[in-house]
Amino acid sequence: LGSAYVRYYSRLRAAGDREGCAKLNGMFLITYLILGAAVLAIGFGLSYCDVVFGKKLTAEEISLAQRLLRILTVNAALTFPISVFESHVTINERYLFQKIVAMGKQVLNPLIMIPLLLMGYRSVTLTIVSLIFTVLSGVINIFYCLTRLKMPFAFHRYDFALLREMFGFTVYVFIGIVVDNVNWSIDRTLLTWFH
């Protein structure tokens, strides 16, 4: 989805259309908020369906799986609107900032997770820490985009024609990602089928 934002934003920026850039930012943010809300609704809905977890789990394991699914759903839902700001950092070529945020997450993650594991905390705590990292990196990106990059937003006149065009572009990108993932994981899939 980030590649669609980069493509259309760079096209508008090259044309010098600042108002178009602001409308595009608003449109992407609204679209990604809607997608995030859909992920939230689907994830929470699935967390209440015992069929999803199968029949081999105990009641305690199902309860744990439900909590984990809810936390991971919130994490996934937040990544959609946050990706608008991360893509804006990319389009403005602030790679050093991106690398510092990514390295901060990579360094802090084991520094926090390993002591928590050694203290006896389990998967729910680790998943919550992962959610906290997502929120913190998102807040940092949002703050950077709004203060340093002066990211403009306009939320009037939603451009449905552009949304259709963008959807067509995104479908091809999505198919490419799925094919790439299938190619990279076919060996594991075959092993699980035949094992």
Q: What does each of the following model-derived ranges do?
A:
Residues 32, 68-72, 76, 98, ...:
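Residue-level signature of transmembrane alpha-helical cores of multipass secondary-active transporters
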Residues 45-46, 57-82, 99, 103, ...:
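Alpha-helical transmembrane segments of multi-pass membrane proteins
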Residues 77-104, 121-124:
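Membrane-interface junctions at transmembrane-helix termini in multi-pass inner-membrane proteins
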Residues 124, 141-189, 193:
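Interhelical loop/hinge segments that connect adjacent transmembrane helices in multipass membrane
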